[in-house]
Amino acid sequence: MIRQYLILFMFFLLLGGCAHQIDTKTTLYDDWKPRLAAQKTWQVEGKLAFISPEERQSANLNWQQTTNSNNLILTTFIGTRILSLKQTVNGAELEFDGDEYFDTNAAELLKRLTGFTLPVDNADNWLKGTIDDQSLVVDELGRAKQVLWFDNTGKKWQIDYGTYVQNAGYWLPTKLTLKHQQIKIKIQLYDWQFK
């Protein structure tokens, strides 16, 4: 008799546990896009692939932004640092091959020393998918799908947003592709954090 009650108790306990599963997704803000655009302190990790007719390169990335600085660190897949690029109001600093270099523009400094073209100066808008432009195409949920955009140096970029994840009340891009002439940059993002 006690055994039957114990089995019945365990059955109801199991049933109750299934009925109260916790949803791991956060609630989406109704005004998620303007809130995300206003969010100026963030960090994201991911992978980056640079593809041109001459070469193909890939790296892990750690991108951090605060109200005063933008810091991009690229590492190999085993964790060896390739470069560190920091932009502040005072200028840009690039650590590459054990040396430090300085300039006023982070994207130009990166291009000059590595040959790598990436519009790092406006990353806050295009990386989060909050870019606002007349050419912007959005999906049925209001998320950026594609945009033609000019960076600070006048280069025209086509940015295609592949997939999103719902996190911290926002829709955040997880896969995007940037194209400029014959250059293609594929970025996969994960582990978005906001402070």
Question: Where are the language model's segments positioned?
Answer:
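Bacterial Sec signal peptide processing site at the extreme N-terminus
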Residues: 12-35
